């Protein structure tokens, strides 16, 4: 049920209006940050759309609902990268386009879920565009993305756009309390992009403790021109999926602290840098953005070595 993730309700309420009036566009673009449980919304929507008895909810017992529950519905198609981290190819989209020209096997809607839509390469995007321009009757494309800027503008313009907004801090904290997490620092949400689901996972798997260890090590490494940075570089390599984001959040909060800004989600180490050195913090953050772009473009690079170079540069500007 969507009650599990109440922040999904506003988008569902709008989708439900379209289902009840049978005014569903040929293409929907569903956007959210990662970790907001959007897969639950997709499941809920697909079951309601394909149900043979009710217009805006799944009855749970018709033939279509039973097929959906067993993941064998012939009119529900998922288009995903064949391997994690790879692109959705033009051949996959062409196969999807051919299916879109066929009739529904259960005389209802046909639903094509493309996830993540931003992983389509250029050829795949262009192939899909032709189908979106002339969608078949009772044929719906649901494009799911965490980064809509990577989609072709022409594709975005042909979709009805819905955004799942992260819950407010108050709503997220309340949800985590309901899950049994009573003592959650507000800054944990920031480290997890506002996602209470990811924050809860971070608390349970030790990621929050790992961040605090990184924060202490980084601040110590930036405390004097002669400080050792090797431990911090090793930690960054060990937590390669998170450390660059951790450093970014810490530096941006530290810049705010230089101007006396205080926020509920501010990281505890933000006030521990050398005072009156906004320019140094800005320079370090700018170099970090360049490093992040480099690592994203070339995933095979040695992060520990690159982190070492960045830490040396940061130490110079933060200790000056």
At which residue positions do the language-model features occur?
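Structural recognition of the conserved hydrophobic beta-strand(s) that form the central parallel beta-sheet
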Residues: 112-115, 128, 139-145
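Charged, glycine-rich active-site and insertion segments that engage polyanionic ligands
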Residues: 1-48, 56, 64-67, 137-140, ...
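AAA+/P-loop NTPase substrate/partner-engagement loops
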Residues: 56-88, 149
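Conserved catalytic network of the ASCE P-loop NTPase/AAA+ motor domain
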Residues: 20-23, 53-56, 68-72, 101-107, ...
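Localized chelating/binding microdomains
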Residues: 78-84, 101, 110, 163-164, ...
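Glycine-/small-residue-rich active-site loops that bind phosphorylated ligands and cofactors
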Residues: 37, 84-85, 119-120, 239
């Amino acid at each position: 049920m969507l009650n599990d993730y109440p922040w999904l309700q506003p988008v569902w309420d709008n989708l439900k209006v379209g289902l009840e009036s049978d005014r569903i566009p040929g293409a929907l673009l569903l956007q959210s940050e990662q970790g907001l449980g959007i897969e639950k919304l997709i499941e809920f929507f697909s079951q309601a759309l394909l149900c043979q008895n009710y217009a805006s909810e799944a009855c749970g017992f018709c033939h279509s609902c039973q097929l959906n529950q067993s993941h064998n519905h012939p009119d529900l198609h998922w288009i995903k990268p064949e391997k994690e981290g790879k692109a959705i190819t033009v051949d996959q989209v062409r196969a999807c386009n051919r299916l879109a020209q066929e009739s529904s096997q259960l005389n209802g809607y046909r639903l094509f879920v493309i996830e993540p839509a931003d992983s389509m390469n250029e050829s795949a995007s262009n192939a899909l565009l032709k189908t979106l321009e002339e969608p078949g009757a009772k044929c719906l494309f649901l494009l799911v993305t965490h980064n809509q800027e990577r989609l072709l503008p022409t594709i975005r313009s042909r979709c009805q756009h819905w955004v799942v907004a992260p819950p407010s801090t108050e709503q997220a904290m309340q949800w985590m309390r309901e899950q049994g997490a009573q003592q959650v620092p507000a800054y944990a949400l920031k480290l997890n992009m506002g996602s209470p689901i990811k924050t809860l996972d971070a608390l349970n798997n030790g990621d929050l403790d790992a961040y605090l260890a990184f924060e202490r090590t980084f601040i110590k490494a930036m405390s004097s021109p002669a400080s050792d940075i090797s431990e911090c570089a090793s930690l960054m390599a060990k937590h390669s999926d998170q450390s660059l984001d951790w450093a970014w959040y810490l530096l941006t909060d530290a810049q705010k602290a230089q101007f006396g800004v205080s926020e509920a989600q501010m990281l505890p180490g933000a006030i521990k840098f050398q005072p009156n050195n906004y320019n140094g913090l800005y320079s370090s953050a700018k170099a970090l953005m360049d490093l992040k772009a480099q690592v994203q473009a070339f995933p095979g690079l040695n992060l520990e070595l690159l982190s070492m170079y960045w830490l040396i540069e940061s130490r110079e500007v933060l200790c000056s």
